[in-house]
Swiss-Prot record:
This is NADH-quinone oxidoreductase subunit C/D. NDH-1 shuttles electrons from NADH, via FMN and iron-sulfur (Fe-S) centers, to quinones in the respiratory chain. The immediate electron acceptor for the enzyme in this species is believed to be ubiquinone. Couples the redox reaction to proton translocation (for every two electrons transferred, four hydrogen ions are translocated across the cytoplasmic membrane), and thus conserves the redox energy in a proton gradient. Signal peptide: none annotated. The gene is nuoC. It comes from Salmonella newport (strain SL254). It is a peripheral membrane protein.
Amino acid sequence: MVNNMTDLTAQDAAWSTRDHLDDPVIGELRNRFGPDAFTVQATRTGIPVVWVKREQLLEVGDFLKKLPKPYVMLFDLHGMDERLRTHRDGLPAADFSVFYHLISIERNRDIMLKVALSENDLRVPTFTKLFPNANWYERETWEMFGIDIEGHPHLTRIMMPQTWEGHPLRKDYPARATEFDPFELTKAKQDLEMEVLTFKPEDWGMKRGTDNEDFMFLNLGPNHPSAHGAFRIILQLDGEEIVDCVPDIGYHHRGAEKMGERQSWHSYIPYTDRIEYLGGCVNEMPYVLAVEKLAGITVPDRVNVIRVMLSELFRINSHLLYISTFIQDVGAMTPVFFAFTDRQKIYDLVEAITGFRMHPAWFRIGGVAHDLPRGWDRLLREFLEWMPKRLDSYEKAALRNTILKGRSQGVAAYGAKEALEWGTTGAGLRATGIDFDVRKWRPYSGYENFDFEVPVGGGVSDCYTRVMLKVEELRQSLRILQQCLDNMPEGPFKADHPLTTPPPKERTLQHIETLITHFLQVSWGPVMPAQESFQMVEATKGINSYYLTSDGSTMSYRTRVRTPSFAHLQQIPSAIRGSLVSDLIVYLGSIDFVMSDVDR
């Protein structure tokens, strides 16, 4: 259980810039390492941000992990090219930096550690000795910035092809395809790429066999239907038993974070929909909230409730697809067709409200694109009358089936310790008995005003428990939607603020200054104050977050997107070793991921 304590962001105005020197962890660090050992940075992230010396990094991380109420999860780890950043007053000199975002479940508190690096000495020690899930994050940090990770067990490219040259998130790396030479796939290059994709067990510390027999190495994917996207897993098999495996990702990588550096704060919104392409408005929520923290915008109550309503509609939509395809992976075909009928009703409702279906790009900085249309309440009421009975039928016909239970109970099971070590969030974490839902413990967009429960498992997260928790989450989302229907506030659908983008249309027809602002914001883009902000949300597949750095420009200096699926796929080998190939298929179906969410 976590303490019922909201984070500092909820207690203060969303845009307040704070150093959080009053956070107990700052005192604990200073008592242990001295009052002058760190530089504490004031930000709008809502969490303490502490710059530590590279030589102290592992010691500080170990100290935080062993506190009485420890920081048990490495939530995120990545880097930043600081060379062109102009607003750095009071910060340590740095050409590059690496940040480590840790979470304490018992405290319901976070801390971010930062390490400053010079261009001629780009190296940090590996964090995998403390948190095993640092592995993939460090590989991506090296790949994107060229920062060497000393002691890393397998420092290779993870998102880009192994033949790729350069480090894409450096500021001197081109952001547009037109800045590259035209791509030509010659026969020699094609042969080289195929050769690079050939799996060599020795590169991963695997043996090709024992003294008596050879292991089989099997490619599952990257276009296998049970891989749920362009995803490849190389399996080391002894018969049908999985001895070990290597997940291979990156086939869906689109450079979403690099795009954030060349799109305006406003024009980046459509890209957020496509990070996790089933989540729709759920993906827009953390980005828009993070930008509003930078801008200092507090939105009207009506906007909060509308955003919650759209988010919960997309949560139900995503969960229905997840549950039905899981049932299909186990072997039952009918439910997936019924689920698409239900999802069609949601899309009709979403389209009536936003004008679009899967990717509405409907949230705005300071509000939403337009007000709710006439008749939205009737459509929502009809859906709320329809859906509960359908859920009952899914549960009775398929999810309580003894064959499905036999295939999924006890499969790919792990406990709370393993979940925290691998950065698992969402239903996978809650199935272990840890009651941690961001909507409850760190409420945003007015979730604290809604009455709903957080489904929690009994201590072990297996395939069946994860699915059944999602079913109950569906019921809770229906409760939230009913409250949106019954208690939709009156009022404007945009905040009265200079950085609301676009500004309210009626004012542009009366005030020349507002018309000029409208023109500049939709063409050039709004200028956000130079600061850092952070927002996490309970997305459809776990915790999704945006960590934004503004240098006082119309575009983000650094857009860091942390997605739950990236962490969940890294956990696969530890959860599936010793199981059968057929168990892996069930496990993959129970994770709830799409590759766009993994690869960004």
